[in-house]
Regions:
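Acidic (Asp/Glu-rich) sequence patches and key acidic residues
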Residues: 1-128
Length: 128
């Protein structure tokens, strides 16, 4: 999941998803997806209230320390099982981080700064 210290409205989120070639299932939704080749990533926006309902104070404090500010939103990411799905979700996190201060809690349970996300993505040298 992507964790950001910036407030991202549902409209901004939807525009982001569409700008990267993704889709929104219906007007006003705060979820969508991105398909590239045979890989898909589903994205869902959670606001600050949902963060505190769904996650422990300890988790939130850890994210705040890594972000340098309190988390305001989470973008949940769900991947398919295709060979390049992890690369696609890393690309989504990389592009998101160019717009908003963020970190990534990756599929291996590791908390990555944007610099680490950027480095890992650039290692692959893939352009979508």
């Amino acid at each position: 999941m992507i964790i950001s210290s910036e407030i991202v409205s549902a409209e901004e989120f939807c525009n982001f998803v569409k700008d990267i070639g993704g889709y929104i299932p219906h007007l006003g939704a705060s979820r969508g997806g991105v398909d590239k080749g045979e890989s898909s990533v589903w994205l869902g926006l959670l606001d600050e209230d949902m963060i505190h309902e769904m996650y422990s104070d300890r988790d939130v404090a850890e994210w705040e320390a890594k972000l340098g500010a309190a988390p305001q939103i989470i973008v949940e990411l769900r991947l398919d099982h295709s060979p390049r799905a992890k690369l696609l979700y890393l690309w989504v996190a990389f592009i998101f981080g160019t717009k908003w201060n963020s970190i990534l809690y990756d599929v291996n349970g590791e908390l990555l700064s944007y610099a680490q996300v950027s480095g890992r993505y650039q290692e692959f040298g893939v352009e979508w």
